[in-house]
Amino acid sequence: MKLSPTPSELLDWYDRCRRDLPWRDPGVTPWQILVSEFMLQQTPVSRVLPIWCDWVERWPTPSATAAASAADVVRAWGKLGYPRRAKRLHECATVIARDHGGVVPDDVDILLTLPGVGSYTARAVACFAYHQPVPVVDTNVRRVVARVVHGRADAAAASTVRDHADVSALLPKDSSAHRFSAALMELGATVCTARAPRCGLCPLSGCRWRQAGYPPAQGPARRPQAYAGTDRQVRGRLLDVLRDNEFPVTRAELDVAWPTDNEQRERALNSLLADGLVIQMTDGRFALVGEAG
C-alpha cells in the first residue's frame, strides 16, 4: 500500500501546518498524554484545551491524581461530557500509582489492563508518549485511509484487524512513525474532514478518491446525535447541581434541575447512581462519589 506523495511530504506538511496543541509539546509526560486521550474521546479540542491545562497543573502525575478525591476529579472534569471518563481516569491513576510505581506503562498489552483504556487509547499512548511504531486508528485516520488508499468517501464499517493492517502498511520504517501517525490524524481533523474536505490544501492530493472524481458516500447520511432533551442532558443538569455544592444535596434540590419530566429525571439519577458517579447518603441526600459528607 503506497501513499502519494511520499510520507516525507506528509510530514513536511505536518511540521508547517499542525495545530499548536500543548499535549504535543516537548517535555509533556506520558501521563499528561494519557489524560489528553481520555479527554479527547468524543469531545472537541476547543473544549478540552482549558480543562487539560488546568488538570495537568493541578495533578501533574498519576500519584497526584490518585490522591485526589473522586468528587474533586469529577468536579474538575467540568462540562467535557461523558463524566464516567473522569471516574475511570481516577481509577486508572490509582492503578498506575499502586501497581506501576507511578509510571505509565509503555506496553500496549499492559496499557489495555488499565481502567478506561481501550485499544485506541493504549496504542495512542504507546505511539505518542513512547514513540512506538504501532498503528493508531481513530475516525479521522479511517477516513483518510478510505479516501487516499481505497478511493471511497467514507470508511467502511470499523474492523480492528483490517484498520490496523491498513495503517501499519503506511507507517514509515524509521523513527518518524509516531509523527506520521500524528500527521494522519491531523490531516483528517483539519483538511480531510467529513463534510467539507479542503482537497486543495492536502499534501496527498493525488489520492484515489480524488482520482476517481470524488464518488459520493454509499448508504444513508449519518445524522448527528441529538443532545437537547435526552437523558444525557438530564444527567448533565443533575451533575451540575452536585458539582456546584460542596455538601450533599436533597432530592428537592435535584428536582429543580429538571422539573419538566419526573420520570426522565429519576431515570437519569438512577443511571448516575448505577455508574458510581453519584452516591446516596444514609439521610437520603445525594453527593458526588467520594464526597466527604
Predicted segments, located by residue:
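Catalytic cores of DNA base-excision repair glycosylases
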Residues: 4, 8-9, 13-235, 246-248, ...
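Generic leucine side-chain signal with a strong bias for well-ordered alpha-helical environments
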Residues: 40, 242, 269-272
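Charge-rich alpha-helical segments
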Residues: 251-254, 288
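Short amphipathic alpha-helical interaction segments
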Residues: 259-273
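A short, conserved structural fragment
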Residues: 273-286
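Short, amphipathic alpha-helical interaction segments positioned at domain boundaries
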Residues: 292-293
